[in-house]
Amino acid sequence: MDKMKIIGGDRLRGTIKVSGAKNSAVALIPAAILADSPVTIEGLPDISDVHILGSLIEEIGGSFSFDGKEAVIDPTNMVSMPLPNGKVKKLRASYYLMGAMLGRFKRAVVGLPGGCHLGPRPIDQHIKGFEALGATVTNEQGAIYLRAEELRGARIFLDVVSVGATINIMLAAVRAKGRTIIENAAKEPEIIDVATLLSNMGAKIKGAGTDVIRIDGVEKLSGCRHAIIPDRIEAGTYMIAAAATNGEVVVDNVIPQHVESLTAKLREMGVRVETGEDQILVCGTDVLKAVDVKTLVYPGFPTDLQQPFTALLTKANGTSVVTDTIYSARFKHVDELRRMNANVKVEGRSAIVTGPVKLQGAKVKASDLRAGAALVIAGLMAEGVTEITGVEHIDRGYSNLVEKLSDIGATIWREKMTDEEIEQVKNA
């Protein structure tokens, strides 16, 4: 196991390149199961979630080759067999295998997923969708069993706007008989990305990116080439890092429209943000204004940037309120920021941040992926050395983070942990 060390106080300057979208990648790979010939995906991020999904594909008879940039998935010889709990448990998005395997084989057995622990977020909307399409769903010994004689199109209204459920129902419906209509669908860019791949494979999908998606089932889908969209959350994280260090950073390979909510908030704080076609320039400033932020479904402020943004707000003049309407329990980073001298308190679904304070380097632990990003940003701002454990969470969603930040002037590196340190972290 590794730990990450950061010596804070450097101004970030230069160009940083964004990788492919994690939240697309974890759905595009399972989507390839639905094809009858190989699918090539360009620009996949080199993150642990992608590697775990690749090995799951291999366990059910597919082949997966990935050179760190491009993946080729050959689903031809796949069989419907139970997916083991071990790897599935490591990966929240392993639930997309349910929709894809149901769509192709009319049956699937998938262990209940793991990933980030963000409080209550059950997969009941996914199950509701599968049942509407004609599947029976049972929960047996910690695994979900899906079975269907045949899948038939249906009209499905989602009770809550859910990216996961929207994509999973799309995957199950593209080869069903007849028309499926998903109402109150999520509108995230990653949904459009998955729909684009499926359409390139031969699916008939209209309305992805709006709240009503119509899918006309087809008999077969074929392999194709697809280029993944850039990761808007990674882009946003680096935009926040630039503002936090009073830096001057060009974020390259980004779709500016995908980060408009963050751009607006940074400008409100006094940060200069200039957008180009696929680049964004962020220039920090010494004095930042406090702002209030409320996370919402896309195109609102993303819950995935709430934690990194909270770290930035410790530097702003005045009191800021950050409210997470999506995941109420997503404040595990606050205790760690407090260790670094932040003045933050949690009240219900909100974090109240009073600034400006000078953060101090400390030993902190990342409890989940975006908490890890928040602690990296805090470390870049802090005086002295910050040591972060729980780095495996960061590796789930940020490709080559240490190298990318080092290239633009951060003093950041990884070290192997001693057995003694690993024990301490486990018992903490």
UniProtKB/Swiss-Prot annotation:
Record carries keyword Cell cycle: yes
GO CC annotation, single: cytoplasm
Modification sites for 2-(S-cysteinyl)pyruvic acid O-phosphothioketal: C116
Task performed by this protein: Cell wall formation. Adds enolpyruvyl to UDP-N-acetylglucosamine.
Name of the featured protein: UDP-N-acetylglucosamine 1-carboxyvinyltransferase 2
Pathway: Cell wall biogenesis; peptidoglycan biosynthesis
MF terms (GO), sorted A to Z: UDP-N-acetylglucosamine 1-carboxyvinyltransferase activity
Top-level division of the source organism's lineage: Bacteria
Amino acids binding phosphoenolpyruvate: K22, N23
Cited SUPFAM superfamilies: EPT/RTPC-like
Residues that bind UDP-N-acetyl-alpha-D-glucosamine: R92, R121, P122, I123, D124, Q125, D304, I326
InterPro entries for this protein: Enolpyruvate_Tfrase_dom, Enolpyruvate_Tfrase_sf, MurA_subfamily, RNA3'P_cycl/enolpyr_Trfase_a/b, UDP_GlcNAc_COvinyl_MurA
Keywords of this entry: Cell cycle, Cell division, Cell shape, Cell wall biogenesis/degradation, Cytoplasm, Peptidoglycan synthesis, Pyruvate, Transferase
Catalytic activity annotation: phosphoenolpyruvate + UDP-N-acetyl-alpha-D-glucosamine = UDP-N-acetyl-3-O-(1-carboxyvinyl)-alpha-D-glucosamine + phosphate
UniProt record, GO biological process: cell division; cell wall organization; peptidoglycan biosynthetic process; regulation of cell shape; UDP-N-acetylgalactosamine biosynthetic process
UniProt family annotation: Belongs to the EPSP synthase family. MurA subfamily.
Residues annotated as catalytic: C116
Compartments in which it is found: Cytoplasm
Membrane-spanning segments: none
Primary subcellular site in the record, as a coarse category: cytoplasm
EC number: 2.5.1.7
